[in-house]
Amino acid sequence: YIDLREKFNIPSECKIIMYLGRLLPQKGVGDLVKAFSRLNSDIKEKCYLLIAGDGVDLENCKRLTRMLKLNNVCFTGSVNPAQRGNYFAQCDIFVYPVNYYQGWCDVWGLTLNEAVQHGKIVIATDAVGSAYELIKNGVNGFRIEAGNIEQLKSAILDALSQKIAWTAMVKDVELKKLFSYTEMGKRYIEVVEKIVG
């Protein structure tokens, strides 16, 4: 177990807004940094943006963070797959800001499943296929337009102001069960068996 607050010096009163995944241009992490920068300073002081992962866009995101003079942003680097659950367990809000990039979108986005499994408020874009199945807008999170930084900022504010119940995801057993790895595996096998005959 790694205590993220201790490891990254995050005050106990701060809400942790997290992205976990590869840092690539199509993942939209720069949009998340920009949306975070647009929050009022009194709100930013009560939040910490944790960007967990590594990739070709890491230096661009760090540069953007410096340019916007953001203090409450932490880049963790690569996360051991065995520790992913630990990261999800300790964040308050998970953001998956994927963009349409050179015709690319995230057909499913398993990372969103993990956030749902851990009972987190989730914010994802319409470029993430699983967002249509996993997110009940205003109930357990928000699905926003890809690349729309103002919508992303508003969704973060709504999540922080508890316009949706913080316990909604924990209680939404139906979604958690429906999209668990076990259930998804069973449905995948059923589809393959139907195709193979």
Identify the residue ranges that each predicted region occupies:
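A short helix/loop element that forms part of the nucleotide-sugar donor recognition site in Leloir-type
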Residues: Y1-I10
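Conserved donor-binding/catalytic core segment of Leloir-type glycosyltransferases
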Residues: P11-K27, V33-F36, L50
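Short acidic alpha-helix that forms the nucleotide-activated donor recognition element
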Residues: E59, N80-C91, Q117, K136
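Nucleotide-activated donor-binding/catalytic signature segment of Leloir-type glycosyltransferases, i.e.
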Residues: E59-Q83
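Acidic donor-binding loop of glycosyltransferase active sites
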Residues: A89-V107, K120
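Short hydrophobic beta-strand element within catalytic cores of glycosyltransferases
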Residues: L112, V116-Q117, I121-T125
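Conserved acidic donor-binding segment of nucleotide-sugar-dependent glycosyltransferases
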Residues: K136-G138, F142-I149, L157-I164
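A charged, aromatic-enriched C-terminal amphipathic alpha-helix characteristic of glycosyltransferases
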Residues: A146, Q151, I164-K194
